[in-house]
UniProtKB/Swiss-Prot annotation:
Encoding gene (name): ruvB
Binding site for ATP: 39-40, 81, 84-86, 147-149, 190, 200, 237
Positions with a binding annotation for Mg(2+): 85
Superkingdom of origin organism: Bacteria
Quaternary structure (record): Homohexamer. Forms an RuvA(8)-RuvB(12)-Holliday junction (HJ) complex. HJ DNA is sandwiched between 2 RuvA tetramers; dsDNA enters through RuvA and exits via RuvB. An RuvB hexamer assembles on each DNA strand where it exits the tetramer. Each RuvB hexamer is contacted by two RuvA subunits (via domain III) on 2 adjacent RuvB subunits; this complex drives branch migration. In the full resolvosome a probable DNA-RuvA(4)-RuvB(12)-RuvC(2) complex forms which resolves the HJ.
GO BP, sorted A to Z: DNA recombination; DNA repair
Family assignment from sequence similarity: Belongs to the RuvB family.
Catalytic class of the enzyme: hydrolase
Reactions catalysed: ATP + H2O = ADP + phosphate + H(+)
Stated name of the protein: Holliday junction branch migration complex subunit RuvB
Gene3D superfamilies named among the record's database cross-references: 1.10.8.60, P-loop containing nucleotide triphosphate hydrolases, Winged helix-like DNA-binding domain superfamily/Winged helix DNA-binding domain
UniProt cross-references to Pfam families, sorted A to Z: AAA_lid_4 (PF17864), RuvB_C (PF05491), RuvB_N (PF05496)
Keywords: ATP-binding, Cytoplasm, DNA damage, DNA recombination, DNA repair, DNA-binding, Hydrolase, Nucleotide-binding
Length: 363
C-alpha cells in the first residue's frame, strides 16, 4: 500500500499564540505531526476507542474486501485530535489499497482535484481533511465523481471550449471535518458511511498512553499513565504530547520513569491542572467570576478583560469549558457555573451561579 501526501496537502497553521497551547487539540508543529505518524496505529485491531465507529468500519470494510469493491464514501467528523486522519490511513491499510491525502483549503481550482482523481487506481482511498472548506467550484466537480466515477472537464477556451467526460476508477472518498454543520447538504448526502468521533474516556487514554510509551521506550506505570490520561481533555493527540513533555521532565529530574508523582510535578510545572485546564482556561473563568460577578457577560467584554481575541475565545478556549460544564453561553452572555466556582476554590453567590455542569470524566 502506498501513501501519498500532496505537496499542498496541509493549509498553513494559524500563528495565534493560542494555537500553540500545550493542551491544544490541533497539531502544533511539523515535528509533532511526524511523531504522530510514528505512533499511529496501523490496523483497526490496534485502534483504541470509538467502539461504535470501529465496529461499523470492520463490517463495511470486510464486506467491500469480500466483493473486491470500493468501500462506500466515508465522512468522519468530531473535535480535532480524536483520530480522523488515523482512521483514514487504517481504512486504506485494511482495504490493501493506496491512500492519497490532501485538504480542502488547498484544492483551490477544479483542475487541482481533477489531477488527483484521474491518478487514482481502482478502489484507492482519497482522504480530504477539512472537507468543509472546499470551494463551491471544486465541490461541484466532486459530485459526479462520487456518484458516477466521472468528471466533466473543459477543453479549450472561449467559443471553442467544450466539456468532455472522463471516466474514473472506482474509489473511496474519506472526508474529515471538525464542523459537520458547515457541509452543504448535497455533499453530506453523498457519504454512505458517517461516523462521529467522541472524546475518549480516561481508561481508553491510559491504553493509548501506555502503547505510545512502549513505542517511545519510556518506562511508565499505571498510575503515571492515568495521571496523564485525566489531564488530556479526552484527546489522544494531547495525551501523546503530554507524554513527551513529561518524559523530558522524568529524564532530567528523575530516573526517566514516569510515575504518578513525577507526572504531577511535570504537569504542574507546565500549568496543566488536574482537569486539563491551562492558564488561558483559568484566566477566562477567573475573569467571568471575579470581574463580572459570574456573569452574564458579553464576549467582547471577556476578550478585553483577558487580552485575547474574541474569535480565539469562542473557537479555541470556550468549547471545552462549555462541554465540561464550567461555562454557559446564554442569550445575555457567558455565565460561570457552580463547577467553575468549585474548581477555582471560590464561594459562589447565593443563587447567582449557573447549574453544575455534567462531567465527561466522572464515574
Amino acid at each position: 500500500m502506498a501513501i501519498q501526501t500532496d505537496s499542498f496537502a496541509a493549509a498553513p497553521a494559524p500563528s495565534s499564540g493560542s494555537t500553540r497551547r500545550l493542551i491544544s487539540a490541533a497539531p502544533t508543529s511539523p515535528n509533532e505531526e511526524a511523531m504522530e505518524r510514528a505512533l499511529r496505529p496501523k490496523l483497526l485491531q490496534e485502534y483504541v476507542g470509538q467502539a461504535k465507529a470501529r465496529e461499523q468500519l470492520e463490517i463495511f470494510i470486510g464486506a467491500a474486501r469480500k466483493r473486491s469493491e470500493a468501500l462506500d464514501h466515508v465522512l468522519l467528523f468530531g473535535p480535532p485530535g480524536l483520530g480522523k486522519t488515523t482512521l483514514s490511513h487504517i481504512i486504506a491499510a485494511e482495504l490493501g489499497v493506496n491512500l492519497r491525502q490532501t485538504s480542502g483549503p488547498v484544492l483551490e481550482k477544479p483542475k487541482d482535484l481533477a489531477a488527483i482523481l484521474t491518478n487514482l487506481e481502482a478502489n484507492d482511498v482519497l482522504f480530504i481533511d477539512e472537507i468543509h472548506r472546499l470551494s463551491p467550484v471544486v465541490e461541484e466537480i466532486l459530485y459526479p465523481a462520487l456518484e458516477d466515477y466521472q468528471i466533466d472537464i473543459m477543453i479549450g477556451e472561449g467559443p471553442a471550449a467544450r466539456s468532455i467526460k472522463l471516466d474514473l476508477q472506482p474509489f473511496t472518498l474519506v472526508g474529515a471535518t471538525t464542523r459537520a454543520g458547515m457541509l452543504t447538504n448535497p455533499l453530506r448526502d453523498r457519504f454512505g458511511i458517517v461516523a462521529r468521533l467522541e472524546f475518549y474516556t480516561p481508561e481508553e487514554l491510559v491504553r493509548i498512553v501506555t502503547r505510545s510509551a512502549g513505542l517511545l521506550n519510556v518506562p511508565i506505570d499505571a498510575e503515571g499513565a492515568l495521571e496523564l490520561a485525566c489531564r488530556s481533555r479526552g484527546t489522544p493527540r494531547i495525551a501523546n504530547r503530554l507524554l513527551r513533555r513529561v518524559r523530558d521532565y522524568a529524564e532530567v529530574k528523575s530516573d526517566g520513569r514516569i510515575v504518578k508523582r513525577i507526572a504531577e510535578l511535570a504537569l504542574t510545572m507546565l500549568d496543566v491542572d488536574p482537569r486539563g485546564f491551562d492558564v488561558m482556561d483559568r484566566k477566562l473563568l477567573e475573569a467571568v467570576i471575579h470581574r463580572f460577578d459570574g456573569g452574564p457577560v458579553g464576549l467582547d467584554n471577556v476578550a478585553a478583560a483577558i487580552g485575547e481575541d474574541a474569535g480565539t475565545i469562542e473557537d479555541v478556549i470556550e468549547p471545552y469549558l462549555i462541554q465540561q460544564g464550567f461555562l454557559q453561553r446564554t442569550p445575555r452572555g457567558r455565565i460561570a457555573t457552580l463547577a467553575a466556582y468549585r474548581h477555582l476554590g471560590v464561594t459562589p453567590p447565593r443563587g447567582g451561579a449557573g447549574p453544575v455542569g455534567s462531567d465527561l470524566f466522572e464515574g
